[in-house]
Amino acid sequence: MARKYELRERAENIAATRARIVEATVALHEQLGPARTTISAIAGRANVQRLTVYRHFPDERSLFQACSAHWTSRHPRPDAAAWELIGDPRERLRAALLEIYTFFRRTEGMTGHVLRDLHESPALREVAEPLVQYWLHVREVLDEGWQAHGRQRTLLRAAVGHAIAFETWHSLTGREGLSDAAAAAAMVELVGAVEG
């Protein structure tokens, strides 16, 4: 009976150590970004040895996957399926941008750092691929129903893509000082103006 208890306790300790490493990684990625986070910094923050980090996560990809899964579970992306139920494309865009910009506000540190660091790490790009696909799907959902054709359709699609970009939100609410709601309204007007 003592052996089973010891095995269970050991498994719990391993899980707790892994969780500390993941939490430390998430915190450092939010603060510094994935490219500037070192294994030494993760180990220090998690209060473990570097070798312990490597035992749990033998490569960048496995560490990024664990970090991404943990962070995403705490910060779910807006539900694009709900927007598909809104028939009017302008109202759909307005509702979506309000949710998207609120999401960006809550996740600004991590989102900004990950986007900045994507070009530096093939492992990060691989782990972020579902995120890239999500944003492509969002653009498809928000592109539906507008009455634009030909060149205007191309411009409208670009305007929708611009409206949902983190960098657009960051510029409008940071440098330009708009609220999330005012930034969303401005982007709805921009896309509407492209439609004509």
Residues covered by each model-derived region:
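Short, hydrophobic secondary-structure boundary micro-motifs
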Residues: 38, 112-114
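Basic, helix-initiating cap at the start of DNA-binding domains
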Residues: 1-51, 56, 62
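Hydrophobic alpha-helical connector segments
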Residues: 66, 77-109, 132
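Hydrophobic/aromatic-rich alpha-helical bundle segments in the mid-to-C-terminal region
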Residues: 144-190
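Short helix-capping/turn signature of helix-turn-helix
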Residues: 57, 116-120, 163
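Residues in the recognition helix of alpha-helical DNA-binding motifs
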Residues: 56-57, 186
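Alpha-helical DNA-contacting segments of helix-turn-helix folds
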Residues: 29, 64-71
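Short, basic, alpha-helical segments at the C-terminal edge of helix-turn-helix-like DNA-binding modules
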Residues: 39, 68-76
